[in-house]
Each structure stands twice: as C-alpha cells, then as structure tokens.
Amino acid sequence: NFDPQHVFDDCKYIYVLRFDFAILIDDKVIGIIEYDGKQHFEPIDFFGGIEGFEKTKIRDNIKNNYCKSKNIPMLRIPYTMSINEIKDVIYEYYLSLTTAGCA
C-alpha cells in the first residue's frame, strides 16, 4: 500500500511534517519516498525565496533524521530525474524493501 502525504505525529517543525509517500505492509511503514522539487536545492521566489529555502532545508533535515532514528529507509527523488528514471528508481526501491526482509 502507498499512503500519500503520510504523517508521523512526532515528526514536527512548528507543525506536523508530511512525507510525500509512505510504503506500508500490514499497516507498518517500511519506506518513505520524498520528491524534491527545485525549491529543495535553491531559493525560488514562489516558495518564499531565501527564507523559504532555509526552512525547506530545516524540514528536510528533520525528516532525514527522523527516518534515520526510526530505521525507516527513505528515498529522495530530485526534480532533475526524468519520469522513466523515477519509475525505475521507485521500482528498485520497492523491490529492495520487500525482498530484504523488511516486509
């Protein structure tokens, strides 16, 4: 199962942070997927410019550290990947989660 906009009540930065997708088996999160748009790599006016970029980096670090502390594998997909590359990397990631004893 995939759960879009998944939240963990204890993962917060001012408010509860949303993860783009959680992969679940038997209602247990076995992996997280985050799609990182351009605003994750450089300031974009639409997303708050420099201040928004700094906050995005803080939220990304909180999410990274949260998953690491909970032993939840996380896949970050940069906006620079093509659709075909994204399909391939998600497929490989899913296989690694479901065949590595995580399921």
Language-model segments: what does each one mean?
Residues N1-A103:
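Nucleic-acid endo/exonuclease domains
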